[in-house]
């Protein structure tokens, strides 16, 4: 969990949502 938190802070909120959700969904939008 700590590792994920660090990576999340490094990448923008958009990258976090994209990682959690499938890329196809993000690409469509």
From Swiss-Prot:
Region (Disordered): 1-29
Compositional bias (Basic and acidic residues): 12-29
Entry superkingdom: Bacteria
Protein name listed in UniProt: Protamine-like protein
Organism whose genome encodes this protein: Escherichia coli (strain K12)
Lineage: Bacteria, Pseudomonadati, Pseudomonadota, Gammaproteobacteria, Enterobacterales
């Amino acid at each position: 969990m700590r590792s994920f938190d660090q990576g999340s802070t490094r990448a923008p909120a958009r990258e976090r949502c994209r990682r959690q959700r499938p890329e196809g969904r993000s690409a469509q939008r």
